[in-house]
């Protein structure tokens, strides 16, 4: 029969999976938003859900630390959970930032560079894989997420060069900067996915 402590750790596991699923959802929605889908309010609502879930998990972690005496491995799991939810919360914030930028992009009929769409797909994949790595305790998947970040960084650098050239030609400066910031937020989301993968790896150190 599971102890109260074991049940709390299992609840922590379930809550992180739930928060991770919300992050996957909000990133997929932001990807749709930059393509013109009418889902901006849904992004904002999902970001609020992520914020609420972060507070719930923080409270659970504090209860575990205050009322239990976790051994080293369990303590690592709780510490990693606190780091992971911080990164997940930032993913929600950056998806909301992308949603804000997508309003101007859509209203002004700005053409989205193909590479931004590809970058969005890469970051969606990284977030999904980082959550899957946690669920499956898969260290190989953690390493894949970390390696994939190089491709996202390369794509961001290419986008910077492409937008600089387009702005030099005839692209409106504000439109160019909004597209650049959209790509920058995606690059940061990739960084947060890497942080989550690293937290998962830390949890399962022997």
Placement of each model-derived feature along the sequence:
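A structural feature that tracks compact, well-ordered secondary-structure segments
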Residues: 85-103, 130-131, 142-146, 153-160, ...
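Secondary-structure edge/capping motif, primarily at the C-terminal ends of alpha-helices
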Residues: 27-37, 61-68, 99-106, 130-137, ...
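Amphipathic, well-ordered alpha-helical segments in soluble domains
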Residues: 19-29, 53-60, 94-98, 122, ...
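A positional/architectural concept
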Residues: 2, 7-9, 13-51, 58-59, ...
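Hydrophobic/aromatic-rich structural module bridging two neighboring secondary-structure elements via a short loop
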Residues: 63-86
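A cross-kingdom feature marking solvent-exposed beta-strand/loop segments within repeated
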Residues: 67-74, 108-114, 171-174
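Conserved small/polar residues in nucleotide/adenosyl-binding loops
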Residues: 203-206
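Conserved amphipathic alpha-helical segments that form helical-bundle/coiled-coil interaction surfaces
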Residues: 39-63, 77-80, 129-163
């Amino acid at each position: 029969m599971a102890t109260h402590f074991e049940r709390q750790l299992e609840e922590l596991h379930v809550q992180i999976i739930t928060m991770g699923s919300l992050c996957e959802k909000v990133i997929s929605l932001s990807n749709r938003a930059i393509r013109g889908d009418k889902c901006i309010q849904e992004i904002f609502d999902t970001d609020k859900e992520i914020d609420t879930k972060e507070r719930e998990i923080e409270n659970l972690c504090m209860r575990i630390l205050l009322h239990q005496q976790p051994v080293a491995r369990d303590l690592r799991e709780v510490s990693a959970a606190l780091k992971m939810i911080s990164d997940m919360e930032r993913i929600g914030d950056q998806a909301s930032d992308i949603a804000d930028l997508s309003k101007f992009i859509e209203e002004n009929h700005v053409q989205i560079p193909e590479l931004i769409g590809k970058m969005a797909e890469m970051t969606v994949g990284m977030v999904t894989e980082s959550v899957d790595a946690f669920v499956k305790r898969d260290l190989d998947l953690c390493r894949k997420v970390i390696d994939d970040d190089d491709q996202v960084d390369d794509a961001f650098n290419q986008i910077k060069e492409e937008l600089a050239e387009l702005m030099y030609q005839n692209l409106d400066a504000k439109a160019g900067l909004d597209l650049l910031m959209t790509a920058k937020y995606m690059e940061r989301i990739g960084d947060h996915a890497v942080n989550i993968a690293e937290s998962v790896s830390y949890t399962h150190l022997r």
